[in-house]
Every structure is written in structure tokens, then in C-alpha cells.
Curated annotation (Swiss-Prot):
SUPFAM superfamilies: Positive stranded ssRNA viruses (SSF88633). Residues 82-238 are annotated as: S domain, virion shell. Pfam families: Viral_coat. This is Capsid protein. Homodimer. Homomultimer. Interacts (via GW motifs) with Arabidopsis thaliana AGO1 and AGO4; these interactions inhibit RNA silencing ability of host AGOs. Interacts with host TIP. InterPro entries: Capsid_prot_S-dom_vir (IPR000937), Viral_coat (IPR029053). Residues 239-351 are annotated as: P domain, projecting.
């Protein structure tokens, strides 16, 4: 365009922008010179394409098909113990129609029945453990129309309470979340520390590797009740075999207890007396035996266990036995006494 007659005329008239344009080209002009040239020659600016935010539209699939195959645990011997690899079901997450998350937690210690329902039996024979591989798999069982989200996070402090809001949950490093109808995996970094297998007495901070935090929120009222399953996939080293151990947890109502962590007790002051609740920390079938030094207001009764049967009399110097089937962690039985810390003993056994 530098040969345009108009450019030659402006150059002959001494216009600096025209002279420079003829000799060196349009690209060498300054912004002000280009503006002057356009005005002099009546050149209109070309429209500039404006950036537009890219939106990717996703459609939920009509159906998702997948298959999971359970395998036998792999066990190998080591110099001072064994190495075991396996996969176990922790829980089934349920919908939560609230916008704030509802939490379910799982303590990471081989003696924890609510997390490791198979590993607990073998771990009871060893003094120490070390996880060398640890990950958690969420497997959906809800349709693709299910709303809200599911999140998994790991906290190294097993005694710390869950986050108090959604922002705190997502502030946890490594937190993974997705819609309920999509599966995902949370991989937890392990360390080289040997920890003690919990005995039900020690401070959890000294024996537990941490805890898994599971959260659900935002589901609709008409969504499926069950969202999906959470499984743990692990490789653990068990060290320093201790020999024979008890499969039963024993204790009294003063809080002294020993053995694997099968149950936890809580108490509240009611109108009829002190209400004692026994919560089972894992699922399965349990035997619970109580010895009363003093007659209670009421003996063993079902609170929310899936199945319950009781034998024996709730009287002074008597023993009551209950068979309890637990389908969900935290289900349990109850009794009422006149004393906050009644004299007596109890034994819990997984059968």
C-alpha cells in the first residue's frame, strides 16, 4: 500500500509518516503515526475478535457399568514380621440433603474394626505396624441424576474433630471430591514410622496413623439413599509378634478397658437414671456380656442395632448376655442405672 498515490502525495508534501511508510513499511510506524495516517487516508480499523470464555458442556451418562473383583489378601514373611496387602469395605455413604457436609470418619490403625474388619484379627498378634501403601476408593452405586458431591480427605491427627464447614474441608491438602455417580481414588502418602497397634488405652495420637474423612452434601430429596461404597486398599508391615492375644474387649463402667477396640461407651443423665449407650465400632455379629454388682433400673435393650437378643436377668450379682447384629458402624444397645459409674464389668467379642 506504500505505492498508493495518496501516500506518494503526502510524502511529497513532507508528511513524515508517509515518507517513513514508503521507505520502511507500515510496521515501522509509531502508534501515533499510524493513527495520523488512518485519519488522513480515511482507513477504518478492522474489528478485533474478543476473547470468549470457553464453556464445556457435559452430559451425564445414562448408565455407568463397572466391575470390582475381591481378591484374597497377599501375605509374605519378613525378617521381623509379615507384610500383608488387601482390600476391605469401610462403609456405604448415604445422601445428605444439607448444603453443609455430613462427615463419616475411619481411624487408620490395624486394630480398628470400623476400618479393617479382616486385618484386625492378624494385627492383634503383633506389636507394631507400618503402612507402606494406602489408598481409598469410592465406588458409586447411585444413578447419574444424583446431585451434590462426595469428598474424601486424610488427616494425620486421628483425635482432631472433623472440619466445621465446607471451606475447612477443602483446605485439607489432598482432598478429593466428585459428583456421587463418578468413582475416584484418594492416595495417602505413607511414612517410615513404626507405630504401636492400638490397645484401646493409649493416646490415639501415639498409635494411629491418622483418619479418613468422608463427606457428603447437596443431594436432592428424591435422590437415591445410598451413594456409593468406600474401600481401603493397603499394604502394611506387621512387626514383633507377641504371641497369643485376646479377641475380646473387656472393661468396667469407670472407663478402664483392654483388648481390641470393638465398642465405645457413652452416658447421659436421663429422667429414670443414667443412660449408658454401647456403640459398636465395626459391623458384624457381636457378643456382649454384662455382670451387675447392683441391679440396674433396666438391663440391656436394643437401641438401633439390626438384630438383638438377650438372655439372663438384670439383677444384683447376675449376668446378662446379648447377641447383637450390627449393619452400620455406631449402632448399639443401652441400659439404665441409678449410678453414673455403676460397679460391674462387661466383655465384647466379635463372633
Amino acid at each position: 500500500m506504500e505505492n498508493d498515490p495518496r501516500v506518494r502525495k503526502f510524502a511529497s508534501d513532507g508528511a513524515q509518516w508517509a515518507i517513513k511508510w514508503q521507505k520502511k513499511g507500515w510496521s515501522t510506524l509509531t502508534s501515533r503515526q499510524k493513527q495520523t495516517a488512518r485519519a488522513a487516508m480515511g482507513i477504518k480499523l478492522s474489528p478485533v475478535a474478543q476473547p470468549v470464555q470457553k464453556v464445556t458442556r457435559l452430559s451425564a451418562p445414562v448408565a455407568l457399568a463397572y466391575r470390582e473383583v475381591s481378591t484374597q489378601p497377599r501375605v509374605s514373611t519378613a525378617r521381623d514380621g509379615i507384610t500383608r496387602s488387601g482390600s476391605e469395605l469401610i462403609t456405604t455413604l448415604k445422601k445428605n440433603t444439607d448444603t453443609e457436609p455430613k462427615y463419616t470418619t475411619a481411624v487408620l490403625n490395624p486394630s480398628e474394626p470400623g476400618t479393617f474388619n479382616q486385618l484386625i484379627k492378624e494385627a492383634a498378634q503383633y506389636e507394631k505396624y507400618r503402612f507402606t501403601s494406602l489408598r481409598f476408593r469410592y465406588s458409586p452405586m447411585s444413578p447419574s441424576t444424583t446431585g451434590g458431591k462426595v469428598a474424601l480427605a486424610f488427616d494425620r491427627d486421628a483425635a482432631k474433630p472433623p472440619p466445621n464447614d465446607l471451606a475447612s474441608l477443602y483446605n485439607i491438602e489432598g482432598c478429593v471430591s466428585s459428583v456421587p455417580w463418578t468413582g475416584f481414588i484418594l492416595t495417602v502418602p505413607t511414612d517410615s514410622t513404626d507405630r504401636f497397634v492400638a490397645d484401646g488405652i493409649s493416646d490415639p495420637k501415639l498409635v494411629d496413623f491418622g483418619k479418613l474423612i468422608m463427606a457428603t452434601y447437596g443431594q436432592g430429596a428424591n435422590d437415591a439413599a445410598q451413594l456409593g461404597e468406600v474401600r481401603v486398599e493397603y499394604t502394611v508391615q506387621l512387626k514383633n509378634r507377641t504371641g497369643s492375644t485376646s479377641d475380646a474387649q473387656i472393661g468396667d463402667f469407670a472407663g478402664v478397658k483392654d483388648g481390641p477396640r470393638l465398642v465405645s461407651w457413652s452416658k447421659t443423665k436421663g429422667t429414670a437414671g443414667w443412660e449408658h449407650d454401647c456403640h459398636f465400632l465395626g459391623t458384624g455379629n457381636f457378643s456382649l456380656t454384662l455382670f451387675y454388682e447392683k441391679a440396674p433400673v433396666s438391663g440391656l435393650e436394643n437401641a438401633d442395632a439390626s438384630d438383638f437378643s438377650v438372655l439372663g436377668e438384670a439383677a444384683a450379682g447376675s449376668v446378662q448376655w446379648a447377641g447383637v447384629k450390627v449393619a452400620e458402624r455406631g449402632q448399639g444397645v443401652k441400659m439404665v442405672t441409678t449410678e453414673e459409674q455403676p460397679k460391674g464389668k462387661w466383655q465384647a467379642l466379635r463372633i
